[in-house]
UniProtKB/Swiss-Prot annotation:
Job of this protein: Involved in peroxisome biosynthesis and integrity. Assembles membrane vesicles before the matrix proteins are translocated. As a docking factor for PEX19, is necessary for the import of peroxisomal membrane proteins in the peroxisomes.
InterPro entries hit by this protein: Peroxin-3
GO cellular component term, pick one: peroxisomal membrane
Stated name of the protein: Peroxisomal biogenesis factor 3
Assembly notes: Interacts with PEX19.
Primary localization: membrane
Region (Interaction with PEX19): 120-136
Family under the similarity heading: Belongs to the peroxin-3 family.
Transmembrane domains' residue ranges: 16-36, 117-140
Amino acid sequence: MLRSVWNFLKRHKKKCIFLGTVLGGVYILGKYGQKKIREIQEREAAEYIAQARRQYHFESNQRTCNMTVLSMLPTLREALMQQLNSESLTALLKNRPSNKLEIWEDLKIISFTRSIVAVYSTCMLVVLLRVQLNIIGGYIYLDNAAVGKNGTTILAPPDVQQQYLSSIQHLLGDGLTELITVIKQAVQKILGSVSLKHSLSLLDLEQKLKEIRNLVEQHKSSSWINKDGSKSLLCHYMMPDEETPLAVQACGLSPRDITTIKLLNETRDMLESPDFSTVLNTCLNRGFSRLLDNMAEFFRPTEQDLQHGNSMNSLSSVSLPLAKIIPIVNGQIHSVCSETPSHFVQDLLTMEQVKDFAANVYEAFSTPQQLEK
């Protein structure tokens, strides 16, 4: 039996060698293919896990953004009420002073200024914090992903994070003061000559707010000239035009200072982008729309109006004397700058444009390839 097999192999030696080579090649290719498939599967699994981890970190970061905004609103409200103290004027009016008309005129300007500044500053706070916390969030994600790797440098240590995020104080300090000045001038120009007895409908109020917005947003200090000659909406109030005090020092900067300056410059680039201006403008449109919605309940038709079958547009069918509108406007700050999630703040925090913009910022700063560009 063995001899006959051996004779067969000798007679078909070349064929057997060829067949053995083919079978061996198929076996090796099969093993190689299995290895490659396993490597691809492992790589895809690792990428999926990394993507899921990054998505989880992003969503957690957005919750942090929302909580940070809500936690800072009382500080913003207090700063506004301190600089635009209408309560002191209201207290004076209760004593029936001889200059009552003059005080009412001051109250008119301060009340409108305060509510309009509240809308602007709250919108700025929401969008600016989205930028800052997603930039720093991207760096933190990369730092966490690099834990355990040799030769890696922490991109955003805690002290840098604290120093960088403290730059929000410009919006709550000097930036807010400048914004108040500009808006107060615009309010004075549009409403200064309007009599307290003059009646305004909700539609009239909307038109007045549009006129004030146009003056504010076209003001020379409200537009930031970018490197390409374009203008960024209201960025001046969120970050100072001049170099940061750290950069002015020129020498003697610590590694922490250098990293902080890098983060601030990256933030500045984001604020100069067309996307930022678009998102901020969308927030402002929503904010002023919500402000009017809040006041609309005071302009509801009376039963007498309804009995007369008033078919006019509800926005213009009811008018109130300006003197009665002032207290309504004056109280809006408590809704706009409420740390308890109100419809106003919730609208801003849940806007799709804000979410998409935040995702783009986070994507840019949580991807190593993007940071290397």
